[in-house]
Amino acid sequence: MKTIFFFITFIVLVSSCTSNIMTKSISQVKSQFFSPALSPNVDPADEHIGHSPDDMKIIFCQQCAFHCIEKKKNIGNCENSICRCTLEDIL
């Protein structure tokens, strides 16, 4: 009876340690996957290079044109981040 008790206790301790080790290794793998380390030669400020103002105007005017087309209107004006569609319907 004592042998069975010690054997079960030993199995519980081993499984507990194994569980803790597996949890730590999985969390380390996940943290490496979601936040990869930057190489020392890369400036973090250069990671996300934004669009130039001209690019942003082109993108805005494209979105404006799509908006007007969805309303079945012609694009009237696209300046200073203001989108205006014509009153006439597209033929």
From Swiss-Prot:
This is Defensin-like protein 220. Belongs to the DEFL family. GO terms for biological process: defense response to fungus; killing of cells of another organism. It is found in: Secreted. The lineage of its organism: Eukaryota, Viridiplantae, Streptophyta, Embryophyta, Tracheophyta. Coiled coil: none annotated. Residues 1-19 form the signal peptide. It comes from Arabidopsis thaliana (Mouse-ear cress). Disulfide bonds join C61-C78, C64-C83, C68-C85. GO terms for cellular component: extracellular region. Keywords: Antimicrobial, Disulfide bond, Fungicide, Plant defense, Secreted, Signal.
